[in-house]
Amino acid sequence: MSTLLDKTRKLNKILQKSGVEPVVFDDICKILSEVLGCNVYVISRKGKVLGYNFPDGFECSTVKNKIISEMRFPEQYNNKLLNAHETLPNLSNHGICVFEDGTPCDLEDKVTTIVPIIGNRERLGTLLLASFGEKFTDEDLVLGEYSATIVGLEILKSKNDEIEEEARKKAVVQLAIGTLSYSELEAVEHIFNELDGKEGLLVASKIADKVGITRSVIVNALRKFESAGVIESRSLGMKGTHIKILNDKLLDELKKIK
């Protein structure tokens, strides 16, 4: 049997990838499932299944149809998970399915362990372990809590990356807007008022006549936005120009100027 050290080293290999490449939650679930011989789920705070793994023969039809098909746990059950503020080991379902009240469980002697995923003093999700026939040992719980720490670090990293990306996109839009002259800014406001959503067809001459500016002002404004990577434009000849917004912060920043 593998020692605790051997099992921890397997998990460490995943942790060592963090920062170089994104950690896939399914990878953590797979390794933990292999070393503990149990079903493993990584669940977000809102109940979404971020990763899971089942050993052979440990998949029941209810889980497959209700959980895996939607990749989400029922809200009522997820609320129970979130109410666990520390590790709750070896919870028995007493032969009753926890997802279908009163229905007998397909698998006998099921025990569940709930491990909260916490990072930066915030509840980020839950690591759920389900075993059949054998209770989790203290060694298993150590590995479970260690894995929850790895997952928590990765969720925090993903959140930080998302915040940084949002700030970058916002800064790019602000710089692009800053390069426009007053007349070009006026033209841009009318252009995106004409668009239906994130993309659409623009006839520059119609907007020029409507606003009372030259067509060249519109063309220059679009070129500046395109060179900044904020939009993508494609000429369709006499039909006009097809415009697609690439940066989802553009419309929000234009609204602030009005």
UniProtKB/Swiss-Prot annotation:
Segments for region (GAF domain): 1-156
One of the record's GO molecular function terms: GTP binding
Gene Ontology CC terms, in alphabetical order: cytoplasm
GO process annotations (BP): negative regulation of DNA-templated transcription
UniProt DNA-binding region: 204-223
InterPro entries documented for this protein: CodY, GAF-like_dom_sf, GTP_trans_reg_CodY_C, Transc_reg_CodY_N, WH-like_DNA-bd_sf, WH_DNA-bd_sf
NCBIfam families according to UniProt: codY_Gpos, PRK04158.1
Protein name according to UniProt: Global transcriptional regulator CodY
